[in-house]
Amino acid sequence: MAGNSAPARNAGLALAEQMIEAHGGAALWNQLDAVRVRAAFGGTGFRMKLLKVPIRATIIVRRGGQHVTLEPYPSTGRQGVFEGSEVRIESADGRVLSRRAQPRRAFGDFRHLLWWDALDLLYFAGYAMWTYLCVPFVFTDPAYELHPAGTWQEGGDTWRKLHVRFPSGIHTHSRDQVLYADQRGRIRRHDYTAEPFGAWARAAHYSTGHQDFNGLVVPARRRVHPRRAAGSPRPHPTLVWINVEDVAVAAGNHCLPAESGRRPLVSIYAC
């Protein structure tokens, strides 16, 4: 995608701002220090790499920088830490049990064609969850190139497309990604190439069951399917699935108070 002209950036930003508002708004997001999600995930893509799934974990994504923790991971009494250029597995008392620097560079060799280890999955899951929870809020950063890309008809609905080029220093699936917003601005589909799997791994990622968790709108279900070159998805297999069970948010030294009338599913963790 060519560099962002001012008119294109402005048009793309207008759509991005609608998405941001539909997912809770910039004012809420800018208050937050972290988002905690309890979720389970699995799928054919992981089984292809000889990984034991499903995995159920508490995932904490810090706002600002790329820092994600998964616990328990890869087993009880341990946690995984993703920090972009490094992943590590720690014991309950914080001892580093294993570490990999520059984990993205490890993909592409013969071993990775056959199987992934716990650090590989930690890198993939870490950047993926950072992407899913921080998008679309990060698009206010001018380092993200934004271009409106027309509309898309699917399932009787019309979705608006936003083509995004991520900054080169951000760990994510691929630099070029496309998001599809419904009339309310909620992200319903997200296209990318899952590069750690390979340049062939074109994905169509669907989000459904959006719920309001203390003001932050998060989809409860995510399903990832192969994407044909023309853009249509293949219904099978389900490469990745994610089921969100609970979401909590924290701001500063205090957790955000639950508002009356919110769903009882919402919980706030001790900051």
Explain the meaning of each model-derived region:
Residues M1-A22, R263, S267-C271:
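Amphipathic/hydrophobic helical signal segments and adjacent flexible N-terminal regions
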Residues P7, E21, A26-R100, P148:
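N-terminal mature ectodomain segment of secretory-pathway/periplasmic proteins
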Residues A8-A14, S91-I170, F197-G198:
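Flexible, processing/modification-adjacent segments and terminal tails
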Residues R62-H67, A106-W115, F213-N214, V249-H254:
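Short, surface-exposed linear segments at secondary-structure transitions and domain or protein termini
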Residues G65, G80-V87, P103-G108, L133, ...:
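A general structural signal for short secondary-structure boundary/capping elements
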Residues W115, A220-R221, A258-R262:
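Short, surface-exposed secondary-structure junctions/capping segments
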Residues T140-P148, H236-C271:
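Intrinsically disordered terminal and processing segments
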Residues G156-L256:
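Gly/Pro-enriched, hydrophobic low-complexity segments
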